[in-house]
């Protein structure tokens, strides 16, 4: 029975994603050349086990690969593994590895590398709790790797496909490297060339790449990947108008993060197109539940009461849609009716009542944001005005995105409220939310959420799993660990006369893409 339960989790996102990825016309691929991509910022680190930011992950998934990966519709598919067997009531997972896979340094990948990677992940990753229930590993031969868990986990394979904090396979030589100090040696189609942290990064074709020849084409992050490009140059350009100008003048082939107004400037230009992805991410206000004022749930709930979603969306100008839930409506775990009571409250009078109960006396509330993503900055600025209407002393701090992102994930920087977007958890389903739920709001202890996640992971009964997820979402929103803003879309611009093979996805992928 449990293998069926495992499969049921892997199919949760099909209804969401399928309409996005219709077949694209066949085009003639050409090999060679450099594609120039202008994005909002550069990565702080290329250690996959610590990577939760899109600007890091878009690069990381070109260099590194996982045992199982997301396909085009976000289901789990074998990647570095050729086969996965689940046994012992979903407590034993046996991975048969593809033979002949090489790292970018020419070394063949074996089960020793896989085991060393799992062991390093458990020591350094932000998402190390993924492996907290491991009893032992076995590597009986170079192409077999076995994970033994202490308890049933019906969603273990589903968790391994995650694109955030990905459990990629590194050479065993990296096992003892501290966090953020790993060498960029991967099995992916590209390898790191040049990296100037305030300017640009260049990926080069990995000549040692071993494609999965059992597949006809790439499929999400799985399947047959081909590096047609000699190189990809990532230019870090924080200003959206400057990115658009780079596309219009031919200095960039692809650009990130267009607002609706900027995207309209491409209308009527036959050589330039917009790549639209929706749903893409979900935007939230994140409240630091272990720091100062926002350690008090009454303060967090007061902040929730002032939020006027329409005013925020009007200010940001991004592609968006209202939705109170942590998931998208096609999901069988969607809890929109329950979540609605915590959404778009716009009730400053209620906020004042909660502030009085909390004993608030005009202390400074720090709102931290960044200048790289205008929608984040503008959201925080609008929120600060809404907070002031309720009598909250809001102090806005604008820093760079990578500092903002690191502070969000580490809890550093003395902030109370920030904002960001989460892309993979809403698409991939309830199990993927666990690391996000705990990491970003810095929840110290919440027994109700702990127990519900335990039921979600271990139960073989679908109604029980649904009830567990509804309990998690209800508690999470009630305690205002985060406040939902909206579902958001992505608008990217590209030169259609020069770029071929580019397909919509919530990450840009430059394998199986070429320049004409």
What are these regions (language model features)?
Residues 29-30, 85, 96, 129-174, ...:
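Surface-exposed binding/hinge segments that line
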Residues 37, 106, 385-435, 467-470:
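Periplasmic binding protein-like
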Residues 38-88, 119, 185:
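N-terminal lobe/hinge region of extracytoplasmic solute-binding protein
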Residues 47, 265, 290, 294-331, ...:
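Periplasmic-binding protein-like
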Residues 82-127, 140, 146-148, 246, ...:
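Aromatic- and charge-enriched surface segment that lines or borders ligand/interaction sites
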Residues 89, 104, 148-166, 185-242, ...:
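Aromatic-rich, solvent-exposed beta-strand/loop patch
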Residues 190, 320-357, 373-376:
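Structural transition elements
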Residues 344, 395-404, 431-498, 516:
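Extracytoplasmic/peripheral linker and loop segments enriched in polar/acidic and small residues
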């Amino acid at each position: 029975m449990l293998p069926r339960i495992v499969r049921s989790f892997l199919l949760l996102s099909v209804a969401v994603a399928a309409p996005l990825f219709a077949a694209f016309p066949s085009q003639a691929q050409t090999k060679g050349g450099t594609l120039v991509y202008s994005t909002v910022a550069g990565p702080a680190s290329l250690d996959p086990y610590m990577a939760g930011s899109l600007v890091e992950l878009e690069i990381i998934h070109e260099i590194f690969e996982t045992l199982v990966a997301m396909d085009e519709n976000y289901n789990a598919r074998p990647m570095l593994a050729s086969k996965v067997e689940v046994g012992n009531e979903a407590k034993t997972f046996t991975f048969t590895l593809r033979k002949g896979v090489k790292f970018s340094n020419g070394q063949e990948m074996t089960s020793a590398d896989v085991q060393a990677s799992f062991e390093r992940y458990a020591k350094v990753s932000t998402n190390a709790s993924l492996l907290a229930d491991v009893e032992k590993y076995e590597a009986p031969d170079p192409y077999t790797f076995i994970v033994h868990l202490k308890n049933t986990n019906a969603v273990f394979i589903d968790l391994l496909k995650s694109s955030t904090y990905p459990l990629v396979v590194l050479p065993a030589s990296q096992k003892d490297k501290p966090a953020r100090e790993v060498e960029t040696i991967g099995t992916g189609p590209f390898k790191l060339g040049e990296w100037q942290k305030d300017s640009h990064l260049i990926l080069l074709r990995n000549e040692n790449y071993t494609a999965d020849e059992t597949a006809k084409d790439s499929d999400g992050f799985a399947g047959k990947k081909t590096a047609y490009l000699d190189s990809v140059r990532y230019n870090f350009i924080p200003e959206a108008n400057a990115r658009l100008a780079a596309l219009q003048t031919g200095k960039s082939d692809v650009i990130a993060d267009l607002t609706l107004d900027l995207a309209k400037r491409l209308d009527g230009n036959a050589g330039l197109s917009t790549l639209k992805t929706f749903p893409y991410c979900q935007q939230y206000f994140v409240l630091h539940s272990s720091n100062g004022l926002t350690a008090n749930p009454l303060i967090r709930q007061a902040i929730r009461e002032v939020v006027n979603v329409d005013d925020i969306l009007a200010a940001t100008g991004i592609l968006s849609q209202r939705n109170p839930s942590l998931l998208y409506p096609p999901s069988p775990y969607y809890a929109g009716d329950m979540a609605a009571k915590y959404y778009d409250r716009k009730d400053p009078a209620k906020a004042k009542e909660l502030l009085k109960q909390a004993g608030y006396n005009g202390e400074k509330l720090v709102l931290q944001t960044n200048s790289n993503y205008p929608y984040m900055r503008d959201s925080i600025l609008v929120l600060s005005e809404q907070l002031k209407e309720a009598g909250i002393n809001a102090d806005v701090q604008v820093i760079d995105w990578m500092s903002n992102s690191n502070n969000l994930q580490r809890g550093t920087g003395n902030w109370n409220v920030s904002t960001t977007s989460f892309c993979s958890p809403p698409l991939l389903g309830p199990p993927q939310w666990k690391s996000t739920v705990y990491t970003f709001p810095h929840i110290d202890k919440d027994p109700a959420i702990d127990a519900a996640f335990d039921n979600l992971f271990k139960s073989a009964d679908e109604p029980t799993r649904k009830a567990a997820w509804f309990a998690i979402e209800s508690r999470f929103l009630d305690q205002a660990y985060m406040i939902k803003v909206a579902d958001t879309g992505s608008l990217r611009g590209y030169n259609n006369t020069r770029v071929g093979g580019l397909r919509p996805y919530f990450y840009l992928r430059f394998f199986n893409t070429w320049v004409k």
